[in-house]
């Protein structure tokens, strides 16, 4: 049997949640191949206010086409502090910065809570500094 998604990361469930004028896109660990297909199938419907950055900020995701389509205001990167993969990748950070996104990172800010009333977003990182835990 031919598996068009040879990497199981591309089988991740992708969910978009909308409430009023706010929307959140959770693309799991998808990679460039799945991003391309999503852009082709959903197009502008992928646009969101908050994006959980695909695959923890791996350079195998967050293609220019995907970012241009999704156009997030806030990009949240879920990555462990000093993780062995060194996520997020510097080129991914640069891509989101170039798009003008506010970047939040769990490796630096710990748990991040984002809530909305449908119009305004409230962002509450556990650690208010951009310095990673234990930094002196």
Predicted segments with their positions:
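Cap/insert and terminal regions of metallo-dependent hydrolase folds
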Residues: 35-110
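Core dinuclear metal-dependent hydrolase active-site scaffold
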Residues: 1-50, 108-136
């Amino acid at each position: 049997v031919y598996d068009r998604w040879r990497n199981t990361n591309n089988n991740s469930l992708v969910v978009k949640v909308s409430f009023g004028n706010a929307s959140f896109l959770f693309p799991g660990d998808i990679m460039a191949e799945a991003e391309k297909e999503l852009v082709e199938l959903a197009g502008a419907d992928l646009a969101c206010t908050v994006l959980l950055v695909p695959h923890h900020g791996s350079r195998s995701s967050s293609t220019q086409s995907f970012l241009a389509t999704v156009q997030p205001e806030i990009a949240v990167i879920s990555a462990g502090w000093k993780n062995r993969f060194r996520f997020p990748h510097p080129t991914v950070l640069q891509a989101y910065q170039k798009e003008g996104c506010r970047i939040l990172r769990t490796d630096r800010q710990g748990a991040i809570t984002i809530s909305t009333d449908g119009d305004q977003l409230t962002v509450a990182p556990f650690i208010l500094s951009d310095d990673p835990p234990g930094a002196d």
